[in-house]
Amino acid sequence: MLKKAVYNREDFLKLNNLPQRLRIWAEDTELEDYIRDEAFYHRALPRKAPMALEPLKVAVVGSGPAGLGCADQLNRLGYDVTVFERDDRPGGLLMYGVPNIKLPKDLLMEKINDLQARGVKFVLGWELNAPEDFDKLQKDFAAVVLCVGSRKEKNLPGIEVDNKQIFHAKDFLTEVTKDMLNGTEYANLKGKDVVIIGGGDTGVDCAAIALAQGANTVHQLERQECDATANSVRDNLCNIVQGDFTIKYGTQMKRLIRDEEGKLKAVETVQVEWRSERAGALPDALPVLGSEKLLRAQVLILALGFKGPEDEIFEA
């Protein structure tokens, strides 16, 4: 049993009984290599680049990948750039949405510090959620660029997120990284049974973190069959996951089971098959009778993707 959570690649790869798919996930350094070798370097600009005739002030709202990239380009073109971020650290998805195992945060901060050294300013703890906020930006800056990303999570009907036993993946990953960066590493999934709904990249991130925190069991559910998923051709995935008990394809959650005190204790699942009930109709995930199973679960993480920007952005 882990004494504390593991949040770096080297130690993660030393974990016992690490599924091959998560070993491949951890060994993939493509994102880290890009941030280190390509991102935000002060390269020579093309001759026809539209350089600013004067250092006009530009506001960039959001400091995720799009916001940082925008700030970098505008800075290189001679503009006076200020980046507004609602979190306590810049970086957005790169800071809080990607585990430290995949993207070391000290590397990311080196790049952000480089931008600051070039004159890009960062305002943290600032949120765009009212018309007067946007009005002030328009008054103080010659231009405003919105780089807020897609942060409105998808939900499952009847499932209420409480951030105690049931989490959205984004919130879970954010708190994990904040705990690590604030020096309060604690294995809050240690010894627990964890079920993750969603078989995409974010779900894989959550599965890896659950194992890194010493979870007792981890089960990731995906309605699609493996060969129908976006990642099926990558690294010969479908052959690799054969026999991997931590990922269940063609499976969906049927209902939650709680104890007498109302606490989550299990998830009932059912296998599905994709077929059309009538000619010409699109295939749908139809339950396979008699395939129901119970998975112990004290923690449920919803990694269902996003619907778009939050409503407050459009209201502002």
Identify what each model region corresponds to:
Residues 10-38, 144, 148-150, 156-162:
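Helix-enriched interaction subdomains in cytosolic or periplasmic regions
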Residues 106-154, 171, 176-184, 189, ...:
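A Rossmann-like FAD-binding core segment of flavoenzymes
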Residues 3-9, 13-16, 24-25, 56-128, ...:
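Beta1-alpha1 glycine-rich phosphate/pyrophosphate-binding loop at the start
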Residues 2-7, 29-48, 53:
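Short microdomains enriched in Cys/His and/or Lys/Arg
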Residues 40-58, 174-192:
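A short, basic/flexible loop-to-alpha-helix module at the beginning of a structural domain
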Residues 198:
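Active-site glycine-centered loops adjacent to acidic/histidine catalytic or metal-binding residues
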